[in-house]
Amino acid sequence: MRDFKLSGPAWFDACPEPVILAHDGDTAYYNAAAAALAERSGWTLQEETPLPEPLRAIDGVGVQTLELAGEHWVCRTERLKAGLLICLTLSPSSITVPLERLAQMAERMRLPLGSLIGVSQLLAQSDGERTEEKTSQYQSIQRKSYYTLLRMLNTLETLGSLSDGRRPFQGEPLDLGGLCAEVVRRVQSVCDEAGCAVELRQNGGNLLVQGEDDLLRQMLYHLISNAIRAAGDGGQVTLELEKCREKDRRWVRLVIWDSGSGFKPEQLARAFDPAQGAAGLSDRSEGLGLGLVLCKRVAERHGGRLAVMTGASAVTAVELPLCDGLSFGALHSPSDLSGGINETLVQLSDVLPWQCFAEEE
């Protein structure tokens, strides 16, 4: 396993949301997102100085809501040996999407829609000179366009259900290692056409989490799709699973990295903001720019966290708490919920060429 050293400050430096460590009422640590919030709020945030006034009333562990910089935040606190850890997450009710962002998403949906309409019209025309090969090409482009639209709609629907609280958590004991192996196997079966190699490395035996199969599966596909796009033709994508333990805390760490050139810090700064999105992370992006937003919500829903780092290449890390599987009944095996549609082609439709969408015999 690569040593990414994601524990401690290294993890929180990469966290896209404000994190502050307080010790005896003073600021002991803060990350870049906390510094940006302090600047917007007009606070003074420096190490070894008193906490900003709005945060001084926070005491003990738990969850509460705060109004900071004119926005509603969910504040989660945890008592550590080094002090009180304060993690801030913008409340979904405070997230507003500007009209220009909606226009951008509509434009991205218009591309596959236009392609779908165009090839459908060509197929509807009676052309005695059209070869069987050309007809098959049109049908493949038609299928790719439809799958791309379906993927976009699935992303919006899932993100909406997680943001407004109308979907209760229904986790079951699930073998994350088995789920990752299944998804990677399916991805490998179509990645030759994409010109990218994908591999999975596991270390640590059984990796049981209390999870929702469909959401974790959707998160995996989004992260792999991002990595394939970043790696480019002839690139390499690697997933690593590792069981971790620190005192009484047990968790599984999933790290995904690619052979691409990485991202600029200013690109990552907006990657988790629904109002801006990650569409600008790649010139080849054909999605809505909401994939990382969705993945982060899924990780947090499962009691975990997600971070994206960049250097020589992009690295995405997800940590999820482990369970023993005994307190939750029978082990839940990964299931196919695609309803007859090739789920892998849907989830990777924005990075696979049209040749991958030929009708299976």
Regions found by a protein language model. Give the residues of each.
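Conserved catalytic submotifs in the C-terminal HATPase_c
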Residues: 170-173, 197-207, 244
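Conserved micro-motifs of the catalytic ATP-binding
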Residues: 164-169, 208-211
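Sensory modules in modular signal-transduction proteins
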Residues: 1-35, 103-105
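Short alpha-helical segment of the dimerization/phosphotransfer core of two-component systems
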Residues: 144-152
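Glycine-rich phosphate-binding loop
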Residues: 284-294
